[in-house]
A protein has these predicted regions:
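N-terminal beta1-alpha1-beta2 module of alpha/beta enzyme domains
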Residues: 1-64, 68
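Flexible, glycine-rich active-site loops centered on histidine and acidic residues
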Residues: 4-21, 78-109
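Structural motif
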Residues: 41-42, 72, 102-104
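Catalytic metal-binding/acid-base residues of hydrolase active sites
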Residues: 45, 74, 106-108
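Active-site nucleophile and cofactor-binding loops and adjacent substrate-binding regions
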Residues: 48-49, 71-79
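Short, basic, helix/turn surface patches
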Residues: 64-74, 98-100
C-alpha cells in the first residue's frame, strides 16, 4: 500500500522504563516478529525513571534484524549537534542502515 508515493509503514512507540529494562527490548523483538516496521523510543535524558534512548536503541539494534529504529522525538537542545550526528551515524552503521532521525525543538526545555 502506498501513501504520497511512499510505502505505508507501521511502528510502535516504546517507553524506556528503567524499572523493567528488558521490557522495551522484549516489546521491540515482539514488534519485529509481528511484522512491525518501526520501533521508536522516547528520548527524555532528564527523566531518571527512563533508560538512555541512544543506549537502548543500540541494544535493540543488536538484538533485531529488520526493524527501523528511531528516537521519538530527539530533542535538539539537549545534545550538541555533532554528538547527536555521530551517535545516529554510529547506530546506522552498526545496524546496517536501520537508524532514522526524528528531530524536534523540544517540549520541556
Amino acid at each position: 500500500m502506498s501513501d504520497y508515493g511512499l510505502d505505508l509503514q507501521f511502528g510502535v512507540f516504546l517507553t524506556p522504563s528503567a524499572a523493567v529494562p528488558q521490557q522495551a527490548v522484549d516489546l521491540a523483538l515482539t514488534a519485529e516478529d509481528a511484522g512491525i516496521d518501526l520501533v521508536t523510543i522516547q528520548d527524555h535524558p532528564y527523566q531518571p525513571k527512563f533508560l538512555d534512548a541512544w543506549t537502548l536503541m543500540t541494544y535493540i539494534a543488536a538484538r533485531t534484524e529488520r526493524v527501523i529504529l528511531s528516537g521519538n522525538v530527539l530533542n535538539l537542545p539537549l545534545r550538541p549537534p555533532a554528538v547527536l550526528a555521530r551517535a545516529a551515524a554510529s547506530i546506522d552503521l552498526l545496524s546496517g542502515g536501520r537508524c532514522e532521525l526524528a528531530l524536534g525543538a523540544g517540549g520541556f526545555v
